[in-house]
Amino acid sequence: MANNPSQLLPSELIDRCIGSKIWVIMKGDKELVGILKGFDVYVNMVLEDVTEYEITAEGRRVTKLDQILLNGNNIAILVPGGSPEDGE
């Protein structure tokens, strides 16, 4: 396995994030930050200690969840260690 992150396969990079905080930007108006517990070949993911950010007509709604299963088809971007506040 390569040590240089630019030479990693996407699945290897995601695998290195297991047990760490990850920022998941979904298709649509939802973003989630949580601890990645696992994923499969379809990039379906299990996150724990999750904060969900949703953009609504009233503004940004924040929801705390113990655990969530995400469908990989709805994931647009993964940011290891990041969160929406990092961009503000």
UniProtKB/Swiss-Prot annotation:
The modification N-acetylalanine is found at residue 2. Disruption phenotype: Embryonic lethality when homozygous. Pfam families: LSM. Expressed in roots, leaves, stems, flowers and siliques. Coiled coil: none annotated. GO terms for biological process: deadenylation-dependent decapping of nuclear-transcribed mRNA; mRNA splicing, via spliceosome; response to abscisic acid; response to water deprivation. It is found in: Cytoplasm; Nucleus. GO terms for molecular function: RNA binding. Keywords: Acetylation, Cytoplasm, mRNA processing, mRNA splicing, Nucleus, Ribonucleoprotein, RNA-binding, Spliceosome, Stress response. Residues 9-84 form the Sm domain. Its main location: cytoplasm. GO terms for cellular component: Lsm1-7-Pat1 complex; Lsm2-8 complex; nucleus; P-body; plastid; spliceosomal complex. Component of the heptameric LSM1-LSM7 complex that forms a seven-membered ring structure with a donut shape. The LSM subunits are arranged in the order LSM1, LSM2, LSM3, LSM6, LSM5, LSM7 and LSM4. Component of the heptameric LSM2-LSM8 complex that forms a seven-membered ring structure with a donut shape. The LSM subunits are arranged in the order LSM8, LSM2, LSM3, LSM6, LSM5, LSM7 and LSM4. LSM2 subunit interacts only with its two neighboring subunits, LSM6A or LSM6B and LSM7. Belongs to the snRNP Sm proteins family. Component of LSM protein complexes, which are involved in RNA processing. Component of the cytoplasmic LSM1-LSM7 complex which is involved in mRNA degradation by promoting decapping and leading to accurate 5'-3' mRNA decay. The cytoplasmic LSM1-LSM7 complex regulates developmental gene expression by the decapping of specific development-related transcripts. Component of the nuclear LSM2-LSM8 complex which is involved splicing nuclear mRNAs. This is Sm-like protein LSM5. The lineage of its organism: Eukaryota, Viridiplantae, Streptophyta, Embryophyta, Tracheophyta. The gene is LSM5.
